Structures are given as structure tokens and as C-alpha cells.
Amino acid sequence: KGFRFLATWEAAFRNMTTKTALNSPADAKGMKLRTFPNEMMRWSLEAMGFTIQIMPLPEVFLAIQQGAVQGQENPIDTIYSNKFYEVAPNITLTNHVYSPIPLAISEKTWGRLSPVDQKAVTEAAQIAGKFSREMIAGNDDNQLKEMAAKGAKVNAKPDMAAFRQAVKPAYDKAREKYGADVDKVLAEAEAIRKTTK
């Protein structure tokens, strides 16, 4: 409220890096995984079998290195730039959460812009959003290749059917809290997933 949405920038899909191989929820059982504070994320990861640890991103590398957690989940670009593959070399491409970055401006600031400036800002935001999405898509492939060349093991085909089955209890919790809209979102996500196979 009080903000105007201008464009979607890209952080891409989130994936996992772990100390040991991760192919299915059976591998996740009891593994301590760092994530960010998000209720739906916590419910889903716990349903997969992980024990969740919330911690700030700058602490994650050392936490994995010292064994406080056995892995983490983030977009490929974050995995690469923070070198998580050095301490958790098993990269599992789960694409379990899409992380868009909304670009917004306060309505107060927007209202102070002339119509010409509003048009220019809107166009620039759209161009930058498109550039961001294209750049991340290209970066992911290159960064995965580079991490593999440095010793990371990339699992591009984990047992996603087992992961999808495992998270169903999290959807029940979401329905209890958020209502019937959860089923609408799940149906839309499934339709998109089927078109992108």
C-alpha cells in the first residue's frame, strides 16, 4: 500500500547446495538447512524432511564450513557469488521457489513526477526488468558450468515428483492460514510447470 509497481526484476529460481548428495526427500531427512524467514518456505522445507535454521546470509558460508548447517538454498547467482559450492558442493536444481524482485516507487514520489517523467521512468523500469531476466538466465548456465569445473556436483534431475508429494502437508497449513486462494495459486503454478517442461 502506498507504492506503485513498475516492473519485475529477476533473482531467479532458488536451488539447494548441500554437503552430501540430495536427490529426494529421503536424503533431506534430518539435514540442517539454512533458509530465510518465510512461513511457507519453512513449512515446505520441513515437510521435505529438513531441519530449518534461519540465519543472515553473511553467516551461512562459515555455518556450513563449521557444520552448524549442512546446506542452504538460494538462486544460482547467490550460490555462485557467495561461493557456497566450496563448502556445500552438491548443487541440486530443485527450482523450488521463484524469486522475483519487484521494482516499485512510492505513490508520493510518483505523484511529484511530471507525466513525461512518469512515462520515462515506466519505460526505463520495463527495459531494465527485461535486461535483468535475460542476464540472470544466461548467468545461471555459465555459473553452473564454472562451479562444476571447480568441483561442484550438479544434480539437474532430482526426484521432483517425490519433493512435490512431500510438500503437500505444507499446502494444507497454507490453506488453513490463507484460505482457498492457495488452491488457485497451486493450479496456476501447475499449469505453468506443465508448459515449461
Regions found by a protein language model. Name each.
Residues 1-197:
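N-terminal secretory/targeting leader peptides
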